[in-house]
């Protein structure tokens, strides 16, 4: 199988979508998981104020609200968690996102003290973290907090990973990539925008430049700069459209380079890495 055929088969992106149908598909998927696992009563999600967590949060709250209405069980709850490292540059966007999704519960856990303590402990042991490695510490601390909250509320951690992110592996292993359920997978970036538009989301939340904003020395570094390819090019590629050869090569290189992130820990029986 050619590399592009394999990528398209793995990422499951449709050439065209009906935004309303895809919204219902994600909501019903989330509800079905709760109905199957009746001991689960909550969804937990970290909210950044960007497109992906805004969309995921809205879908999660819709699913929880419908579960309460259908079952009469008020124990079903959605926890939207703000996880700043110190002060977040686009805090106003996060507040706008929270107001849009109207979560049952809003929590704020500032991760700065925990991350700084970890960095200091490593330095004391002779391990000096680079700015990039410290950025991954932030992502993993955020996920640790979300799992702690989920543990106390019969919950699962919802992920924001979509196919345009999955194909490039643009997430931290066991950080924002370490979730329980991903309702956006199968959608690319522009399709996510279409869902938010259908849901009546404020435009500025899905038109802003995507950024992981993990590095102290490169605040708000755009994803597209870090990747060396635009989301429009990634979206076109995943929809089977023509893209410049250099963009296709970069996407395919990211896919191969980050394949380990899309698997559990490698065992002697795995051969994808060979």
UniProtKB/Swiss-Prot annotation:
Record GO cellular component, one term: cytoplasm
Functional pathway: Cofactor biosynthesis; NAD(+) biosynthesis; NAD(+) from deamido-NAD(+) (ammonia route): step 1/1
EC number: 6.3.1.5
Catalytic activity: deamido-NAD(+) + NH4(+) + ATP = AMP + diphosphate + NAD(+) + H(+)
Xref: SUPFAM superfamilies: Adenine nucleotide alpha hydrolases-like
Keyword annotations of the record: ATP-binding, Ligase, Magnesium, Metal-binding, NAD, Nucleotide-binding
Phosphoprotein keyword on record: no
Superkingdom to which the source organism belongs: Bacteria
Keyword Cytoplasm: no
Residue positions binding ATP: 46-53, 160, 189, 211
GO MF term list: ATP binding; glutaminase activity; metal ion binding; NAD+ synthase (glutamine-hydrolyzing) activity; NAD+ synthase activity
InterPro entries reported in the protein's UniProt record: NAD/GMP_synthase, NAD_synthase, NH(3)-dep_NAD(+)_synth, Rossmann-like_a/b/a_fold
GO-annotated biological processes: NAD biosynthetic process
The protein's enzyme class: ligase
Residues given in the record as Mg(2+) binding sites: 52, 165
Family: Belongs to the NAD synthetase family.
Described function: Catalyzes the ATP-dependent amidation of deamido-NAD to form NAD. Uses ammonia as a nitrogen source.
HAMAP family xref list: NadE_ammonia_dep
Subunit structure: Homodimer.
Protein name as annotated: NH(3)-dependent NAD(+) synthetase
Organism: Listeria monocytogenes serovar 1/2a (strain ATCC BAA-679 / EGD-e)
């Amino acid at each position: 199988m050619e590399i592009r055929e394999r990528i398209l088969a793995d990422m499951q992106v449709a050439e065209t979508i009906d935004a309303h149908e895809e919204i219902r598909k994600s909501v019903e998927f989330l509800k079905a998981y709760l109905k199957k696992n009746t001991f689960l009563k909550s969804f937990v999600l970290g909210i950044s104020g960007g497109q992906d967590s805004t969309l995921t949060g809205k879908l999660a709250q819709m699913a929880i609200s419908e579960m309460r209405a259908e079952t009469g069980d008020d124990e079903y709850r959605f926890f939207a968690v703000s996880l700043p490292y110190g002060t977040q540059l686009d805090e106003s966007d996060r507040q706008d996102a929270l107001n849009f999704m109207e979560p049952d519960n809003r929590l704020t856990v500032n991760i700065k003290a925990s991350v700084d303590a970890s960095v200091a402990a490593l330095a004391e042991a002779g391990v000096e973290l680079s700015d990039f490695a410290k950025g991954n510490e932030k992502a993993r601390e955020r996920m640790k907090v979300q799992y702690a909250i989920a543990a106390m509320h019969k919950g699962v951690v919802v992920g924001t990973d979509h196919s345009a992110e999955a194909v490039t592996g643009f997430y931290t292993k066991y950080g924002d990539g370490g979730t329980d359920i991903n309702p956006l997978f199968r959608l690319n970036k522009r399709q996510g925008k279409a869902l938010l538009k259908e849901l009546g989301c404020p435009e500025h939340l899905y038109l802003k430049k995507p950024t992981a904003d993990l590095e102290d020395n490169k605040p708000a570094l755009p994803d597209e700069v870090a990747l060396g390819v635009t989301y429009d090019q990634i979206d076109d590629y995943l929809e089977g459209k023509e893209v410049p050869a250099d963009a296709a090569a970069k996407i395919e290189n990211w896919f191969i380079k980050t394949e380990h992130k899309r698997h559990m820990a490698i065992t002697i029986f795995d051969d994808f890495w060979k």
